[in-house]
Each structure stands twice: as structure tokens, then as C-alpha cells.
Amino acid sequence: MNFKNHHQKKRFGQHWLVNNLILEKIKEVAELDEKDFILEIGPGKGALTSKLLDSKISRLHAVELDKDLIDLLNNKFRNDKKFSLQQGDILSTNLDSINKKITKVIANIPYNITGPILDIFIGRLGIVSKNNYKKIIFLMQKDVVDRILSKESSKNAGAMSVRMQLISNIKRICDVPPSSFNPPPKVFSSLVVFEPLRPEKRLDIKLERYIDKLLQISFNSRRKMIRNTLNSILSEDEIKKLAELSEICFNSRPQDISINKWIKLAEGCIKITNKN
């Protein structure tokens, strides 16, 4: 078999990037140098892989789920000592032997595994990552990026935006039309760069966990006012004290609360509950 005879598998969510301008843009925003150890998720036919290997990098390790592509990729890059390939599902692949060496992660993410991919590589509130990723460059569904970057009082505001913005710096580079892929997906994509915050730049872990707790209970009932949501974890007296401490309008709905106010709300909850 060769690449021409290989057909994309729908079950793997394969939409291969064929727009050379976007391939070059990914390489550009990665800001690669000779110290970089790249993890590429889902190299496909190796179009982006080729451009990355042409850069001054230390190494590129690719993880590909499709077994039919393994021999083809190994053959294509057999003369490049910087290249290594692993067959497997990135959601369950063991990367322990190289994880501390990886500096940048680059991927055209299958839409059906976006959530788990974000949890693994960007991280979660209340969990300190042992990874050393400087940049994570993802090509992902535009609607998801809209949600991640949304601000309070917007239609896309939600728990995901607060969580992602608290643990990483995020920048949308450009939107990418369906015609840039083969086969074209039904929706637009966005090229986005995440820079995970170092542990010393993160909030206190206990505070992060409480924020996460508040986000979960609040956005599960996003039409309810915060006052009514807090009834499930605080007494009426505690809610009154919290209103004084946090200076937040408790008639607000969760999507109308800014990130800074979520922090104040969690700090107030911790202070009140620790006194009792």
C-alpha cells in the first residue's frame, strides 16, 4: 500500500490538512529551535511532519492510531534520525519515557476527542501537571475555541472558558475553512496556541479545586441565579456572609460572572467554611 491508496477512516475522525499556507503557519507559530522535542499527534500522511522535520529541532515523536499508516510513515521518514513513531491511541498511550523531554505538542485534533485531549495536555483545575510543555498548538473545531476564549455575559461563556483561561495563556491565530482539509469537515476550524502556566504561576491548588466545584454546580444549572445554586453547599447565613465578602451580585447567573469574581467567590467560600 502507498499513501495514494490509503483512504481516510471516518471512525478515526481523519480530516487531513492540505492547505500549505496553514501548514506553514503552524510551523511559524511553533517558533521551533534546536532544543525542541516535538510530540505530533496524528501525523496522517506526514504533510506537517515533513515541515517540522525540516526545522532545526532536536526530535519529533509522532503517535498515530491508524495501523495502516505506520509502515508508510516509517518508510517516508526512514532517513531522518530525528523522527520516531509510535502506534496507538493518544488517549491511552504511555508517554512516560519521553514526557519530561517534550517541549511542544502539535496536533490537528479529531473533533470527537477534543475534550479528553484538552484534559491530558492542557490540564485541569486542581491538578499540578508534571509536564514541561512550553507551547501546545492545536488545530481544532472553531466552535470549541469560541467557547474556550469567551468572556462573561457572552453566549459562549461557560465552565470550559473559565477553566482553560485559569491554567493557560491562549491565543487564536486564525480560522481555517473546511476546504483546507481532505475530506472537508462540515465546520470551520481554528488554529490556537496554548501556553500552560507554570505551577508557580497558578492559583493555590485548594483554591483551584474549589473554583472547579463552584463551576460544576453552577453551570449544571446555568439558568439559575448564583444564590439558588449556592443553596446546595452553603446555609442561608453563610450565603449572606459570602455576599458581603465577595461583593458579587448573587442575582447573577453563572455565565455573567467574570473569572476574577469566580476567584473571589471561591476565596470567600473557603474562608467561611473554614470558620465553621
UniProtKB/Swiss-Prot annotation:
Gene Ontology CC annotations of this record: cytosol
EC numbers: 2.1.1.182
Keyword Methyltransferase belongs to the record: yes
Gene3D superfamilies: Ribosomal RNA adenine dimethylase-like, domain 2, Vaccinia Virus protein VP39
CDD domains membership: AdoMet_MTases (cd02440)
InterPro entries membership: KsgA/Erm, rRNA_Ade_diMease-like_C, rRNA_Ade_Mease_Trfase_CS, rRNA_Ade_methylase_Trfase_N, rRNA_adenine_dimethylase, SAM-dependent_MTases_sf
Keyword Transmembrane helix set for record: no
GO molecular function, one term: RNA binding
Reaction it catalyzes: adenosine(1518)/adenosine(1519) in 16S rRNA + 4 S-adenosyl-L-methionine = N(6)-dimethyladenosine(1518)/N(6)-dimethyladenosine(1519) in 16S rRNA + 4 S-adenosyl-L-homocysteine + 4 H(+)
Keywords assigned: Cytoplasm, Methyltransferase, RNA-binding, rRNA processing, S-adenosyl-L-methionine, Transferase
Domain of life: Bacteria
UniProt subcellular location: Cytoplasm
Residues noted as binding S-adenosyl-L-methionine in the record, renumbered to the chain: H15, L17, G42, E64, D89, N108
PROSITE patterns: RRNA_A_DIMETH, SAM_RNA_A_N6_MT
SUPFAM superfamilies from the UniProt entry: S-adenosyl-L-methionine-dependent methyltransferases
HAMAP family membership: 16SrRNA_methyltr_A
Annotated family: Belongs to the class I-like SAM-binding methyltransferase superfamily. rRNA adenine N(6)-methyltransferase family. RsmA subfamily.
Physiological role: Specifically dimethylates two adjacent adenosines (A1518 and A1519) in the loop of a conserved hairpin near the 3'-end of 16S rRNA in the 30S particle. May play a critical role in biogenesis of 30S subunits.
Name of the molecule in the record: Ribosomal RNA small subunit methyltransferase A
The organism of origin for this protein: Prochlorococcus marinus (strain MIT 9515)
Gene, per the UniProt record: rsmA
